[in-house]
């Protein structure tokens, strides 16, 4: 019998959990993080489920595994893990992992104040501000983000005909604005979103295909972003992002904020240099900015940046014991 040990640091970014795996993960094959992610999914997805699912995790758990970079221009590599799979990119996960890796001395940037990260979605640059030994804030320059499709429609059980735009900010998002079928965040409950979101994602996923123009390994609709009027006086918009099977992001969501900024830029609401303050379902804020315009294939895109904060909550040495019948974790679902 074998017991696998993983050395983790737990924390949260603006309210959403982050579990950083600092030791115990396997070496991965591949020339880049896309290939290494594929190897991990083929051979080691039990690590993701074991660390993210109950009884060691929970429905909202997400995290990242630290690896040496595959690119000469990067300081470190992140492999993102969460209940829904291995995401190409995770904004809140990057902010949290950067904060904890720096505060614990697990990475030394070549340029003080800047950490360059190798991810399956590409190079992500993180600029951070320190206060003594602590990281006050992290601003990440995300991958090029773009509006993929507008005005898509699908019949969703319990809602009827729903219209949505789909945008990419590191993951594909169905962005649902207030309409006849959805009155807006301020008029629904979190339990409504948990009930509707899987149905909406399935309905749109069956009817349409979503494939990154330059990286076909990134495909499929993984997230649903519900919108509403802001409550915080500094915010431009409020959102609740659904991911996995039963998770609503407690943070404003980094890749979701990037996708929303791409949508607004395509609509002419944002330009280079424009700020965009995004409010989460619990009232925390990410501060976005359009850094540049770009092209992804034939699609117009933006290069967004997002600033947020994170805090470490503790160390966690986790065992996955082969004797444990629940070693790979479990999720409680309605059809159980």
What does each model-found stretch correspond to?
Residues 170:
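Glycine-rich ThDP/TPP pyrophosphate-binding loop and its adjacent helix/strand module
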């Amino acid at each position: 019998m074998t017991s696998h040990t993983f050395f983790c640091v737990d924390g949260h970014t603006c309210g959403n959990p982050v579990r950083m795996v600092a030791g115990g993960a396997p070496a991965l094959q591949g020339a880049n993080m896309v290939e290494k992610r594929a190897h991990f999914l083929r051979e080691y997805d039990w690590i993701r489920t074991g660390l993210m699912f109950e009884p060691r995790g929970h429905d909202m758990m997400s995290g990242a595994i630290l690896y040496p970079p595959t690119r000469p221009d990067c300081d470190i590599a992140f492999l993102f893990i969460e209940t829904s799979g291995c995401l190409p990119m995770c904004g809140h996960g990057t902010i949290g992992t950067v904060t904890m890796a720096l505060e614990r001395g697990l990475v030394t940037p070549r340029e003080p104040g800047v950490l360059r990260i190798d991810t399956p979605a590409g190079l992500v640059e993180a600029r951070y501000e320190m206060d003594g030994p602590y990281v006050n804030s992290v601003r990440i320059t995300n991958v090029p983000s773009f509006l993929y499709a507008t005005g898509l429609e699908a019949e969703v059980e319990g809602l009827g005909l729903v219209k949505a735009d789909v945008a990419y900010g590191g993951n594909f998002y169905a962005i649902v604005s207030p309409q006849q079928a959805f009155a807006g965040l301020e008029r629904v409950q979190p339990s409504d979103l948990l009930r509707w979101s899987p149905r909406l994602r399935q309905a749109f996923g069956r009817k349409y295909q979503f494939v990154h123009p330059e990286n076909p390994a990134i495909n499929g609709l993984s997230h649903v972003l519900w919108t509403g009027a802001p409550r915080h006086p500094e915010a431009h918009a409020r959102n609740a992002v659904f991911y996995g099977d039963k998770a609503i992001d407690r943070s404003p969501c980094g890749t979701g904020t990037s996708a929303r900024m791409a949508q607004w830029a395509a609509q002419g609401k944002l330009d280079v240099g424009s700020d965009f303050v995004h409010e989460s379902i619990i009232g925390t804020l990410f501060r976005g900015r359009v850094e540049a315009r770009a092209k992804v294939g034939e699609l117009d895109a933006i290069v967004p940046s997002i600033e947020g904060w994170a805090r470490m909550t503790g160390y966690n040495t986790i065992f996955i014991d082969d004797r444990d019948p629940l070693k790979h974790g479990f999720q409680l679902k309605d059809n159980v």
